[in-house]
Amino acid sequence: MGDDNTNNTSITKSSPTDAMGGGCPIAHDINPANHMYKPNQNPHPDQTKPLSTERITSTIPRTEKDNWQYPSPQMFFNAMKKKQYEPKEEDMSVVISIHNTVNEKCWEDVLQWENDYKDVCPNPKLKKFKGKATDFSPKAKFLNTFLGYKLPFDRHDWIVDRNGKEVRYVIDFYEGRINKDSGKSIGIYIDVRPAIDDFSSLKDRVLHFFK
């Protein structure tokens, strides 16, 4: 899908694949006051096994002093139940690993775009983000309508702080190739690019197209 000037990444994942197939369930469980995960660390009533409440700190800067924290297995399990999924306690370690790896790769791709502005802003930060699973981007709809690609299973908009300027990035998440034996996707394909909200972002997209 390298039809335009985007950073496209494919990440291999292992079973269970269904957990991420309907959009990231925890990405919408955000406290609007500080854009942090609501820390529901209590065991779910349907839970049959204990889950860790330990949270891993990401490499993604949130402020000058701290980085974003990923949800714990317990938080992720609770969020999935809230979204009407049927998670299994024994799958949470794999689900968390996929979730965290995907987000780290998204940030890595964002930094590739931001590298053009390193003289102005050597340390961009992720200010906030929003899940928009059913709000398909214009590019995703174009690829689906005219080239027959499947629609992404999830979309996030990330707002990056570039020395006080808010720059919006659109991230589309696609299912990767299908395993012939299981019939399920074994990878996640990530399409990261700045939204064309101003002339500067349009220029970046055009310049990257010709690189």
From Swiss-Prot:
Residues 1-53 are annotated as: Disordered. One of its GO terms (molecular function) is metal ion binding. Probable lyase that catalyzes the covalent linking of the heme group to the cytochrome C apoprotein to produce the mature functional cytochrome. Belongs to the cytochrome c-type heme lyase family. Disulfide bonds: none annotated. This is Probable holocytochrome-c-type synthase. Residues 1-17, 39-53 have a biased composition (Polar residues). It catalyses: holo-[cytochrome c] = apo-[cytochrome c] + heme b. The gene is cchl. It is found in: Mitochondrion inner membrane. GO terms for cellular component: mitochondrial inner membrane; mitochondrion. Its EC number is 4.4.1.17. It comes from the Eukaryota. It is an enzyme of class 4 (lyase). Keywords: Heme, Iron, Lyase, Membrane, Metal-binding, Mitochondrion, Mitochondrion inner membrane.
